[in-house]
Amino acid sequence: MKRWSIITGIVIIFCILTCKGQVENKKVDFRTEKGKFVPLNLVPGDVVEYSCPYSLNNDIRNMNGVEREHFDNKKFCFDYIFVGSKLTFLKEYVRGSYNVVHKEEGNLYTSQFSVPPVVLTHRNFDCFCYMEENNVVVKKVLRIHISNGVLRKIPGCDFNADYKESTAITTFSNMSPRRVKVCDVYPKSGDFISLMCPSDYSIKPDGCFSNVYVKRYPNEEVKEEDRFNLNRKWDASKYNVVSIETVLKMNMITQGDKYSIFSKLPDVKDQVDFTCICQSNDEQDNLMMNVYINNTSYLTNNTRSIGVNKHSFSNSEIFERIEREEISFAFSSYLSITLILLYLFFLNF
């Protein structure tokens, strides 16, 4: 009896120490789901896969004309989602969604996407599956809720000009690639940073932010007129590609794909500069993201900067809140462990 009590206590302690904040891969397959309505809660970083054996050529119940048109054009999840009754592009509604892929095998349609590590506001949307059940085509609903993780926009550059400003999660967003070629951000240690490119561009260098561009001549003076010129051109001859470990003396964990990339800056005390770009598929256009870590000189000396009033230079308040939560969790975890051990101790007497 005593031995089983000790084993039970160890299992509980293990769960307390390991079950917090785990990223999950979640699957919803309507071939095996019995109910017609499936709620699914996600958090930043989760990966979800959805499968539906579509039957669209039969008599379909509960489908209005608008839905029928979208489904005839195969505008399925997760490329497209329903927010209320409105068909919406996932990458616009959940900014920074990445690895959005789908495949078809016969009538089975399977799609997957990764929730970005930064979600500014709660997101709610539906996926509709029309499938045959008992010789009748019925409508089944996957209702997804994504919990938010931060309270303020993060330092970053989003060059998707056609997306709604209301769904933006970065300090610079909805910038037209035709008019704006450069975006400068000034994060601090601990901040998330992000670069998001249009669908006909891709992020360079490969593996950004693990690999970055740095100036070949870092002490070269930047001309005053260039500093505020948002149309200044990218000149690859002035940069080298290096590992971020070379720049920061430590690695950074990145998440994303060739269109959207995220990273959380480590604890860096020094002033550090680096660059990543969005390059058009024909390699004729480049959109620059310049990152200036722990650099406040531009703010104090150059308040004339275009867009500086829009730019929120740090989301440190967010991390102060998160750190307090983590400290609180750590304390409660140790308290729980202490109580369990005391319980086991007195149980043995």
Curated annotation (Swiss-Prot):
Keywords: Cell membrane, Disulfide bond, Glycoprotein, GPI-anchor, Lipoprotein, Malaria, Membrane, Repeat, Signal. GO terms for cellular component: cell surface; plasma membrane; side of membrane. The keyword Repeat applies. A lipid is attached at N315 (GPI-anchor amidated asparagine). InterPro entries: 6_CYS_dom, 6_CYS_dom_sf, Parasite_Repro/Invasion_Surf. It is a lipid-anchor; GPI-anchor. Residues 316-349 form a propeptide. It is found in: Cell surface; Cell membrane. Disulfide bonds join C77-C127, C157-C183, C197-C278, C208-C276. It comes from the Eukaryota. This is Merozoite surface protein P38.
